[in-house]
Amino acid sequence: MSIVIIEAFYGGSHRQLVELLREELDDCVLYTLPAKKWHWRARTAALYFSQNIPSSEHYRTLFASSVLNLTELAALRPDLGKLKKILYFHENQLVYPVKKYQERDFQYGYNQILSCLVADVVVFNSSFNMESFLTSIGKFLKLIPDHRPKDLESIIRPKCQVIYFPIRFPDVSRFMPKHKIAHLRRMLSLIGDAAASQSVAPCPQPGQRVSEKSPENCESKSDEHPDLDAEQEALDNPSVHKSGSLPVSKENLPLDPSTLLCGAEDPQRPLHITWPHRWEHDKDPETFLKILMSLKQLNLNFHVSVLGETFTDTPDIFSEAKKALGSSVLHWGYLPRKEDYFRVLCMADVVISTAKHEFFGVAMLEAVYCGCYPLCPKALVYPEIFPAEYLYSTPEQLSKRLKSFCKRPDIIRKHLYKGEVAPFSWAALHGKFRSLLTTEPREDL
């Protein structure tokens, strides 16, 4: 095995990426730690891996997420330190919002800076992630009382590049209501085009949004599903593997499908809003749920599905809102089965983000692929990914738009998304990751 993949936080998007890389690369070996107690993983994972990764003369490349303190690992294991070292940033700690800053929090961002200095290639999942990290280094280091290091941005920047997080969009045709079939056909067509030209288009520069394509043949000649199967099968994996589709289980689903499918083709049924994010303060559930409660007080008709993972400390607003929203709630809580999760997204009309912290946003793109109309803050990574039509500047603007949508849900259901999801697909990006990981290291590394 010539490629060592290390993931100190093996869950969520971190795990998704690693699993895709393992499918693409035969010549790799994976070492992981479970996705819990993030702060302890960031502090101590390097020592653990230094003792548990066996030595091998065949290793050529090391790939790790920025949770790992790469500097410590390279010092503890000089044999690993000599490899071509690739550091991938899903998020960065220099601009992470904390409830109450403590001096110990400095160490997390500092470790990421040190890891960049040791790495040979530093990869970010978005231009926003890269620029927010690099341009914050100077300000961040001013927290040091004296004898501060200098010029680190200029040292690190030449190593940096953007390769978007790759999403394997699954086969959702069997979940799609008829009014979304034209949308799905367009998504599959554009993903296929992106796969064919994956090595041509560069990632956008900071401040530049992913370019739009004019939809060709968006309107379908038929409202039937069968011909979607062949298109999807060809896109599940750029090579031969076809596990991108979601298996239909014979077991009883935790969700009752009739709850979602009943009246799915009624254009005047209540607007279905979904919020598919972690139940933590950095995703700002308070803003979202307070807006919904205000809509409820105005006697506006809507349904809501609040998805996403929950952890030990769940914000109090969730229990308060669930009670206040009452019969408007269709689903409340995390859906561990992917088919249940995508079923909800396909039946929903609008997907909302209220995040204070987002460097990519897998859940929003998955929902858009499933035909949801996105509403996102005009901040963070969102302007890089979504056209201006789908961005809001204030909670008041979000509330106003949702009020309008509640009154005319039929208009939203006729809407065809004007942006792109294709540049973020595994079909489009797998070649870039393969090239990154299989290119021979320079002789002077």
Swiss-Prot record:
It comes from the Eukaryota. Residues 199-227 are annotated as: Disordered. GO terms for biological process: regulation of translation; tRNA modification. It is an enzyme of class 2 (transferase). It catalyses: queuosine(34) in tRNA(Asp) + GDP-alpha-D-mannose = O-4''-alpha-D-mannosylqueuosine(34) in tRNA(Asp) + GDP + H(+). GO terms for molecular function: tRNA-queuosine(34) beta-mannosyltransferase activity. GO terms for cellular component: cytoplasm; nucleus. The keyword Amino-acid biosynthesis does not apply. Residues 210-227 have a biased composition (Basic and acidic residues). Keywords: Cytoplasm, Glycosyltransferase, Nucleus, Transferase. Belongs to the glycosyltransferase group 1 family. Glycosyltransferase 4 subfamily. Glycosyltransferase that specifically catalyzes mannosylation of cytoplasmic tRNA(Asp) modified with queuosine at position 34 (queuosine(34)). Mannosylates the cyclopentene moiety of queuosine(34) in tRNA(Asp) to form mannosyl-queuosine(34). Mannosylation of queuosine(34) in tRNA(Asp) is required to slow-down elongation at cognate codons, GAC and GAU, thereby regulating protein translation. This is tRNA-queuosine alpha-mannosyltransferase. It comes from Mus musculus.
